[in-house]
Amino acid sequence: MAATVKKTGSKKSKRNVPNGVVHIQSTFNNTIVSITDTSGHVISWSSAGASGFKGARKGTPFAAQTAAEAAARRALDQGMRQIEVLVRGPGSGRETAIRALQVAGLEITLIRDVTPLPHNGCRRPKRRRV
Protein backbone atom coordinates (compact mmCIF):
# COMPACT_ATOMS: atom_id res chain seq x y z
CA MET A 1 0.00 0.00 0.00
CA ALA A 2 1.35 3.43 -0.98
CA ALA A 3 2.15 5.88 1.77
CA THR A 4 0.19 9.14 1.69
CA VAL A 5 2.26 12.25 1.19
CA LYS A 6 1.25 15.23 3.31
CA LYS A 7 1.34 18.57 1.52
CA THR A 8 2.35 21.69 3.37
CA GLY A 9 1.51 25.27 2.50
CA SER A 10 -1.23 26.60 0.31
CA LYS A 11 -1.84 25.47 -3.23
CA LYS A 12 -2.13 28.99 -4.62
CA SER A 13 1.00 31.08 -4.62
CA LYS A 14 0.74 34.74 -3.71
CA ARG A 15 1.25 36.67 -6.91
CA ASN A 16 1.93 40.37 -7.10
CA VAL A 17 -0.53 41.69 -9.68
CA PRO A 18 -0.60 45.53 -9.80
CA ASN A 19 -3.18 45.93 -12.62
CA GLY A 20 -6.37 44.02 -13.27
CA VAL A 21 -9.87 43.90 -14.69
CA VAL A 22 -13.04 43.70 -12.60
CA HIS A 23 -16.02 41.99 -14.24
CA ILE A 24 -19.34 42.85 -12.58
CA GLN A 25 -22.30 40.78 -13.73
CA SER A 26 -25.42 42.30 -12.27
CA THR A 27 -28.75 40.57 -12.84
CA PHE A 28 -32.08 41.18 -11.15
CA ASN A 29 -31.48 38.14 -8.91
CA ASN A 30 -27.75 38.26 -8.07
CA THR A 31 -24.48 40.16 -8.53
CA ILE A 32 -21.21 38.37 -9.36
CA VAL A 33 -17.85 40.18 -9.10
CA SER A 34 -14.76 38.56 -10.67
CA ILE A 35 -11.34 40.20 -10.51
CA THR A 36 -8.82 39.03 -13.12
CA ASP A 37 -5.33 39.99 -14.18
CA THR A 38 -4.89 41.66 -17.58
CA SER A 39 -4.61 38.29 -19.36
CA GLY A 40 -7.93 37.05 -17.91
CA HIS A 41 -6.84 34.67 -15.13
CA VAL A 42 -9.19 34.99 -12.13
CA ILE A 43 -7.50 36.29 -8.98
CA SER A 44 -10.56 36.63 -6.74
CA TRP A 45 -14.32 36.46 -7.05
CA SER A 46 -17.38 36.90 -4.92
CA SER A 47 -21.12 37.04 -5.31
CA ALA A 48 -24.10 38.15 -3.28
CA GLY A 49 -24.97 34.51 -2.63
CA ALA A 50 -21.42 33.70 -1.51
CA SER A 51 -21.56 36.70 0.84
CA GLY A 52 -24.39 35.07 2.78
CA PHE A 53 -27.49 36.52 1.15
CA LYS A 54 -30.31 34.22 0.12
CA GLY A 55 -33.38 34.55 -2.05
CA ALA A 56 -34.64 37.98 -3.04
CA ARG A 57 -32.03 39.78 -0.90
CA LYS A 58 -29.29 38.70 -3.33
CA GLY A 59 -30.58 41.22 -5.86
CA THR A 60 -30.27 44.24 -3.57
CA PRO A 61 -27.62 46.98 -3.90
CA PHE A 62 -26.31 46.22 -0.38
CA ALA A 63 -25.64 42.60 -1.34
CA ALA A 64 -23.70 43.81 -4.40
CA GLN A 65 -21.69 46.15 -2.18
CA THR A 66 -20.63 43.38 0.22
CA ALA A 67 -19.74 41.08 -2.69
CA ALA A 68 -17.55 43.78 -4.27
CA GLU A 69 -15.87 44.54 -0.93
CA ALA A 70 -15.03 40.86 -0.36
CA ALA A 71 -13.53 40.44 -3.84
CA ALA A 72 -11.58 43.71 -3.55
CA ARG A 73 -10.14 42.72 -0.18
CA ARG A 74 -8.70 39.50 -1.63
CA ALA A 75 -7.34 41.35 -4.68
CA LEU A 76 -5.65 43.97 -2.49
CA ASP A 77 -3.92 41.15 -0.59
CA GLN A 78 -2.37 40.06 -3.91
CA GLY A 79 -1.03 43.57 -4.53
CA MET A 80 -3.61 44.95 -6.95
CA ARG A 81 -3.81 48.73 -7.18
CA GLN A 82 -5.31 49.80 -10.54
CA ILE A 83 -8.38 48.27 -12.15
CA GLU A 84 -10.60 48.57 -15.20
CA VAL A 85 -14.28 47.85 -14.56
CA LEU A 86 -16.47 46.00 -17.07
CA VAL A 87 -20.16 46.04 -16.11
CA ARG A 88 -22.67 43.61 -17.62
CA GLY A 89 -26.40 43.36 -17.01
CA PRO A 90 -29.38 45.46 -15.89
CA GLY A 91 -29.33 44.76 -12.14
CA SER A 92 -29.67 47.18 -9.25
CA GLY A 93 -26.18 46.55 -7.85
CA ARG A 94 -24.11 48.05 -10.67
CA GLU A 95 -23.27 51.50 -9.28
CA THR A 96 -23.06 50.28 -5.68
CA ALA A 97 -20.48 47.63 -6.59
CA ILE A 98 -18.32 50.19 -8.43
CA ARG A 99 -18.51 52.57 -5.47
CA ALA A 100 -17.53 49.76 -3.08
CA LEU A 101 -14.44 48.96 -5.19
CA GLN A 102 -13.40 52.61 -5.07
CA VAL A 103 -13.90 52.87 -1.30
CA ALA A 104 -11.90 49.65 -0.78
CA GLY A 105 -8.80 51.41 -2.13
CA LEU A 106 -8.61 50.30 -5.76
CA GLU A 107 -7.91 53.03 -8.33
CA ILE A 108 -10.44 52.80 -11.18
CA THR A 109 -8.99 53.81 -14.55
CA LEU A 110 -11.89 52.85 -16.83
CA ILE A 111 -15.56 51.93 -16.53
CA ARG A 112 -17.11 50.19 -19.54
CA ASP A 113 -20.63 48.83 -20.01
CA VAL A 114 -20.46 45.53 -21.92
CA THR A 115 -24.12 44.52 -21.61
CA PRO A 116 -25.00 42.33 -24.61
CA LEU A 117 -27.76 43.87 -26.71
CA PRO A 118 -29.57 41.67 -29.25
CA HIS A 119 -30.04 42.90 -32.81
CA ASN A 120 -33.51 41.32 -32.61
CA GLY A 121 -32.39 37.79 -31.77
CA CYS A 122 -34.44 35.45 -29.58
CA ARG A 123 -38.06 36.12 -28.68
CA ARG A 124 -38.47 37.85 -25.32
CA PRO A 125 -40.33 36.12 -22.46
CA LYS A 126 -43.99 37.06 -22.18
CA ARG A 127 -44.95 40.02 -19.99
CA ARG A 128 -45.69 39.25 -16.31
CA ARG A 129 -49.18 40.16 -15.15
CA VAL A 130 -49.11 40.68 -11.40
UniProtKB/Swiss-Prot annotation:
Q: Which PROSITE patterns match?
A: RIBOSOMAL_S11
Q: Which GO terms describe its biological process?
A: translation
Looking at the keywords, is Cell inner membrane present? no
Give the domain of life: Bacteria
Q: Which UniProt keywords apply?
A: Ribonucleoprotein, Ribosomal protein, RNA-binding, rRNA-binding
Which HAMAP family does the protein's record reference? Ribosomal_uS11
Q: What family is this?
A: Belongs to the universal ribosomal protein uS11 family.
Q: How does it assemble?
A: Part of the 30S ribosomal subunit. Interacts with proteins S7 and S18. Binds to IF-3.
Name the PANTHER family on file: 40S RIBOSOMAL PROTEIN S14/30S RIBOSOMAL PROTEIN S11
Q: What is this protein called?
A: Small ribosomal subunit protein uS11
Species: Prochlorococcus marinus (strain MIT 9312)
